[in-house]
Amino acid sequence: MTRSVENRPDWDHYFMEIAEVVSKRATCLRRGVGAVIVKNKQILATGYNGTPKGMPHCAEVGCLREQLNVPSGKCHELCRGIHAEQNAVVQAAVHGVSVDGATLYCTNQPCVVCSKILINAGIRRIVYRDPYPDKLAEEMLAASGMQVERLDFAEQELSLIHI
């Protein structure tokens, strides 16, 4: 069987598909999110949303946000979990890997808390798949000069179906 070069995913779709696989490790009951930090077409770190290392997962003890009736997008601190983007930056730091100038691929648009961390970590470009409307995050990212793009999978998926 011969594959056509035309059917290969471009780099953005390639790394976003990896972020999708990473999201399958998420332990959040509300939403599974995956993140991949890339520089020069090399993966530097990955992260998914879930509780901190060594702590019980929400699937085991329940969702604190649901228990407290916290609406989506509000009071991010009222959660046992850490976001995928935060986890990816932490993993890079733990292993002594600079993410300055890198691109973050994330299955969801970053919230304001993650946006601030990404700006300070030196991430220069964010590519996301699913929107997560957060006006303050969008304003901060724009003011920082961050390049932010939503990746459209529809066109790419059509070409990949015929492999």
What does each model-found stretch correspond to?
Residues 1-160:
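Zinc-dependent deaminase catalytic domain
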